[in-house]
Amino acid sequence: MMGIMVLCLTSCQNPGQIHRPNADTLYVGSVQASFPTAYMPWLSREGIAPTIAGMLYDSLFSYDEDTGNFVPSIGQEWYYVDQAGEPILTEDGSIDYARLEEVYSDPSHKYLAVKVIIHDNITWSDGKPLTVEDVYYSLDIATNNLLSNHAGALAWTSDLRHKYTNGVLTQRGLFTYEHGAREQGYEIAEEDKDTVIYLHVNKVLGSVMPLFTSVLILPKHIWEPVVTPQNQLNSAAPTEETLYRYRYPVGSGQFVLDTEESGSQQIVLRRRTDYHRTKEDGSPLYNIETIKYVLYQEINVAIYALLKGHIDVLDNSVSSNYLQLFEKEKDLFISNAPGTYIQTLVLNVNPVSSEQNPIRDLLSIKDFRRAIALAVNQEDLIKNVLNGAGIPASSGLMRSTLPDFYNPDADYLPIDYQARVAEANAILDTIVPDRDKDGYRLLNGERITFSILGSPGEQDCISYLEIQFQKIGIKVNYAAKGTQPESTYLYTSRFDMTLHGVSFSLSNIDIMYNAHFSALGRTSNYGRLVNRELDTLIENMRFTLNLNTKYDLIKAIQPILAEEYYKIPLYTSNVISVARTDRFIGYNIVEGSTVLNTSTLQNLKKSNVSR
């Protein structure tokens, strides 16, 4: 297979000349089905769209997983406040969680009060100043589905105590100088009216996370004049005025879209000279003046373009099969970054009644699921599927690189694989002892066979799982998940097993634990797991105001997740990406990211041997 790849990449196209004519432009290859033509940041969260949106627009803050702190963006600082509006901070300026619990643990207090102060020197790309009225507008419309028509925005703001019913504001949880701050008891001086906003959020320590990091702030002066219940923000049939705003974005991010140069085959971004965030010495935050994204629809063609010098960076993770090829090339920076997503095998443990059948019913038996989990050999998958570019994943589905949350007690299954297979067969001999002439187990005379939903790129993984499960007499095969697996199969229980990547950390756990293991319906709990003990622990973890208790509950949840054998870990894959070093240097490896990450963009500079 590797020889075929190399032959194709070196001979299937004529070399041609190097197409990086501008020395100040970073040429970035992106493998997508297509490039977006509309850039309203809430329109799409797939493909390259969120990457571009994150460069054109800003959120209030970003989150640093390593430090656990919010990094200023539009927001300059934030803190919880008490009933008198006084900051709940320690002497060193960090959140005083002990006092927060003391102040708000009383059940009579229904919410946490948060004060956000934004920078006073931000402008939109059209030159208009950005104020808290833009922040208010963005969070307000996110809660008003009659105007936004955006289910994701409702999820981002689910813990914000600012609610609409049929377009009517029924509960106010946002307060500025112009919107009820004084009436609520928050005194904002007139000179601070453009920079201070108060939020009321549910008594959940993670409630501010999506409000701060997921909601890209929109310019009120651009959208308020055109958005109505008849012409919603997220419109399938936008008016001419709305369509113009989609295509010619006005943002507050570090780049602006060059609409004249951008089109269906390329996206050109120009660095703003007036962006409010800079390096400590006052120089631009990013050294790159222009970024040109070039569309490729095949990964092999994109790699060929990189090797031949048509692009500087390939902004896609690639298979570890290409590592051998890259290592033979000069002028390449290979990023083999640790991954943050755990690939899991999700079992349909509780399908809706219309999708139940005798074979699928076996997955509702916990001991049967334990046998499946025992048969998984992560080391073998990492060796053969990832070519060694990955690490084993915990049965508690928490990364061991997060020591404050990872609980090794969740990893209690035997380490020796032969012992695991022997135990799995002993379990199955008590449940489905009959086998056919090929050694596969039978149920009522029928071979037990499960289909595993996956993408074409996941066929290798499923093929090796087929070999592993054969050792315990269980037959599995690959089933294409298609383009809309959630609505076609997963939300409707029309599957046996599926591959699914998960990633849990303090930044998402309040939402994701519930979505993956408790909530039913259109959630990531595809197999409809129901475990009341687990539900209670997740609920307690979510609502405790004691940070130490929260950490303890996160650890307590992991062994219970492991014992359900519901989302069985397969591996954590590295994120492999590549860039050229003949024109730019300063690429950084960041956990869970391709080489084109924020750290790289802030450190990239021209190479002395640029040519």
Regions found by a protein language model. Give the residues of each.
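Gly/Pro-rich hinge or "lid" segments in bacterial periplasmic/extracellular proteins
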Residues: 64-66, 213-285, 290, 421-422, ...
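Surface-exposed binding/hinge segments that line
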Residues: 152-232, 261
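N-terminal lobe/hinge region of extracytoplasmic solute-binding protein
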Residues: 29-105, 250
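Long beta-strand-rich cores associated with HINT superfamily self-processing modules
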Residues: 579-611
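Extracytoplasmic/peripheral linker and loop segments enriched in polar/acidic and small residues
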Residues: 13-15, 366, 370, 374, ...
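Ligand-site clamp/hinge motif
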Residues: 241-246, 275-325, 466, 475-482
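Structural transition elements
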Residues: 255, 391-436, 454-460
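Acidic-aromatic pocket-rim loops
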Residues: 338-341, 346-354, 396, 484-543
